[in-house]
Curated annotation (Swiss-Prot):
Catalyzes the reversible phosphorylation of UMP to UDP. UMP binds at residues 64, 85, 146-153. GO terms for biological process: 'de novo' CTP biosynthetic process; UDP biosynthetic process. The gene is pyrH. GO terms for molecular function: ATP binding; UMP kinase activity. ATP binds at residues 22-25, 65, 69, 174, 180, 183. Allosterically activated by GTP. Inhibited by UTP. This is Uridylate kinase. It catalyses: UMP + ATP = UDP + ADP. It is an enzyme of class 2 (transferase). Residues 30-35 are annotated as: Involved in allosteric activation by GTP. Homohexamer. It is found in: Cytoplasm. It comes from Rubrobacter xylanophilus (strain DSM 9941 / JCM 11954 / NBRC 16129 / PRD-1). Belongs to the UMP kinase family.
């Protein structure tokens, strides 16, 4: 069943009040793959604006792959993996500041919190302060992942979602409208999987998030929604309780 046919269906989660939105660095880069493309940045900003106008408490975790890909270039540069990971974390700070500037130009109060202390440009990550910002209607952008090497920003997003008691973790994808049984960009017969539980996600090795992030969500029962960030209105529809993309959660009561 296509996304348009499912658009009017109600999600079993219902309306969501507080969420963490995971944005990849690549979503800000456009077709070039690197750097920050103004048009791509504006797409994310428009979605966030709709979420804020809908009254949601929104936190964002942004990746840094458009700035620096530590895992890919560590060997080429002859540097340790831990150092490369710290360099990647700094890339997420660049993206977070770009998002903050773009949102505040549109009148959205925004705070950047970094797991690595960079007090000149971002607040340190403090859980209670982050929650207070959300309660006051500010968008909070979490930078630097977990602040530790060897952990992805997906894991950082899962961790922050649990820490701030989010209703769900929203995994934004580019031109992929959910979870597929195989890569739809390679296989023309790929089929979307609209609903699955954590064990299915982990056992089938579906390319949604890394294993550590999925295990964190599974252990605490945090719902995961995978959706296309480039389709206008998707984020707002999710927050309003519509079924969009694919849902990963506990086993449904009826199989």
């Amino acid at each position: 069943m296509g996304e348009s046919a499912r658009a009017a269906e109600t999600s079993e989660l219902g309306p969501l009040r507080r969420v963490v939105l995971k944005l990849s660095g690549e979503s800000l880069a456009g077709n070039g793959g690197y750097g920050i493309d103004p048009g791509s940045l504006e797409v994310s900003v428009e979605q966030v604006l709709e979420a804020v106008e809908a009254g949601a408490e929104l936190a964002i975790v942004v990746g840094g792959g458009n700035i620096f890909r530590g895992a890919q270039v560590a060997d080429e540069l002859g540097i340790e993996s831990a150092t490369a990971d710290y360099m990647s974390m700094l890339g997420t700070v660049i993206n977070a500041l770009a998002l903050q500037a773009a949102l505040e130009r549109r009148g959205v109060p925004t705070r950047v919190q970094s797991a690595i202390e960079i007090k000149e440009v971002a607040e340190p990550y403090i859980r209670r302060r982050a929650i207070r910002h959300l309660e006051k209607g500010r968008v909070v952008i979490f930078a630097s992942g977990t602040g530790n090497p060897f952990f992805t920003t997906d894991t950082g997003a899962a961790l922050r979602a649990l820490e701030i008691n989010a209703d769900a973790l929203l995994m934004a994808k580019n031109r992929v409208d959910g979870i597929y049984d195989k890569d739809p960009r390679v296989h023309g017969d790929a089929r979307i999987v609209p609903r699955l539980d954590y064990m299915e996600l982990l056992s089938r090795n579906l390319a949604v998030m890394d294993h550590t992030a999925a295990t964190l969500c599974s252990g605490e029962g945090l719902p995961i929604i995978v959706f296309d960030i480039l389709k206008s209105g998707n984020l707002r529809r999710i927050l309003q309780g519509e079924k969009v993309g694919s849902l990963v959660w506990r086993e449904p009561p009826e199989r």
